[in-house]
């Protein structure tokens, strides 16, 4: 197969798989079941998908007793989890049941906090298109690719609460060993 054939095959298969993940994440009931099974801490923290497409994802995290710290703001680890999820759902949309099979892994996370989170916080990542290109590059070259996503957390007034950079590694799995 030519490189073009491999990418065309990936895109054809992934358009259905990506749409399936977007539907799952858009259904509150199915999303909660997914969290309970695969990400129970996100379920406990009550992270919610506010918006998801193949280009962007917005995750909300409430300010409540289980998420707060002793300083009466949302605990940084909960904010970090929401930030990672806003990028991770986009990545999952592009690697879920991919042909060829692709692994994804967070290799770095950087966060800066600009304001106390004392209410609901929304994390939005708009890196879906660029992320897809990085994944396609991993397929074309058969070499691991890293991609650095930006996600911005804002409060209900639109003020920036936090800025995160999540670095993902994408690698085509070896079909013989499954790794």
Predicted features along the sequence, with ranges:
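HotDog/MaoC-like acyl-thioester-processing domains
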Residues: 1-23, 117-118, 128-179
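Hot-dog-fold acyl-thioester-processing enzymes
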Residues: 66-88, 101
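Short structured motifs
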Residues: 43-48, 107-113, 134-136
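Residues located in well-ordered beta-strands
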Residues: 48, 110-112, 124-126, 150-152, ...
């Amino acid at each position: 197969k030519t490189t073009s054939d491999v990418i065309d095959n990936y895109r054809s298969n992934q358009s259905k798989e990506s749409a399936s993940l977007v539907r799952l994440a858009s259904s509150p009931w199915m999303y909660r079941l997914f969290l309970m099974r695969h990400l129970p801490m996100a379920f406990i923290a009550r992270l919610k998908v506010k918006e998801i497409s193949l280009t962007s994802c917005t995750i909300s995290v409430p300010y409540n007793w289980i998420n707060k710290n002793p300083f009466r703001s949302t605990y940084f680890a909960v904010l970090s989890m929401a930030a990672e999820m806003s990028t991770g759902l986009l990545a999952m949309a592009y690697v879920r049941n991919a042909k060829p099979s692709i692994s994804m892994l967070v290799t770095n996370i950087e966060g800066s906090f600009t304001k106390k989170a004392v209410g609901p916080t929304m994390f939005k990542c708009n890196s879906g298109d660029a992320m897809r290109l990085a994944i396609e590059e991993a397929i074309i070259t058969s070499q691991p690719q890293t991609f650095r996503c930006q996600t911005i957390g804002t409060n209900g007034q639109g003020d920036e609460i936090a800025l995160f950079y999540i670095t993902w590694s994408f690698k085509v799995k070896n079909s013989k060993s499954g790794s």
